[in-house]
UniProtKB/Swiss-Prot annotation:
Region Disordered, annotated ranges: 122-153
GO cellular component: cytoplasm; small ribosomal subunit
Name of the protein described by the UniProt record: Small ribosomal subunit protein uS9
Single GO biological process annotation from the record: translation
Organism listed in the record: Mycobacterium leprae (strain TN)
InterPro entries: Ribosomal_Su5_D2-typ_SF, Ribosomal_uS9, Ribosomal_uS9_bac/plastid, Ribosomal_uS9_CS, Ribsml_uS5_D2-typ_fold_subgr
Biased composition regions of type Basic residues, renumbered to the chain: 139-153
Encoding gene, per UniProt annotation: rpsI
Keywords carried by this UniProt record: Ribonucleoprotein, Ribosomal protein
Stored Pfam families: Ribosomal_S9 (PF00380)
């Protein structure tokens, strides 16, 4: 028995596995998520729900519980929190941007793993790339839109 088939049997044996035939894939699924200045490369592998973010655990990398919930949301939506291990390389941006980028990358990877989950993820808004980014500062102004105080005389 190969290592892949053993992993598939473990994943199928878990109660959260609804569609066992869609979990069969030879190698890991790789996707990219972006938000603000953050870029995250996600690798989804059959496993037990472990996160490896730049070599650290989810709790170490994102101590904020809000960010942790944001990241786990796509997995919770499709009820697959314990079926996959997630390895991610995060760079650029801050914690909020990286968390949003990781969420998008995970959602995209889940669709490649099981396409029947697409409607649920799309309805929840996990597949939409947030286009908002920082507006540049203009000369003559203090910030992007904040002008210096106007004095008539």
């Amino acid at each position: 028995m190969t290592e892949t088939s053993e992993a598939v049997e473990i994943a199928v044996g878990t109660p959260a596995a609804k569609h066992s035939e869609s979990f069969v894939f030879e190698r890991s699924i790789q996707t990219v998520g972006r938000r603000k200045e953050a870029v995250v490369r996600v690798r989804l592998v059959l496993g037990t729900g472990k996160f490896d973010l730049n070599g650290r655990s989810l709790e170490d990398y994102f101590p904020n519980k809000v960010h942790q919930q944001l990241i786990k949301a796509p997995l919770v939506t499709v009820e697959r929190t314990r079926n996959f291990d997630i390895f991610a390389l995060l760079h650029g941006g801050g914690p909020s941007g990286q968390a949003g980028a990781l969420r998008l990358g995970i959602a995209r990877a889940l669709i490649l793993a099981s396409p029947e989950d697409r409607p649920a993820l799309k309805k929840a808004g996990f597949l939409t790339r947030d286009p908002r980014s920082t507006e540049r500062k203009k000369y003559g102004l203090k910030k992007a839109r904040k002008a210096p105080q106007y004095s008539k005389r």
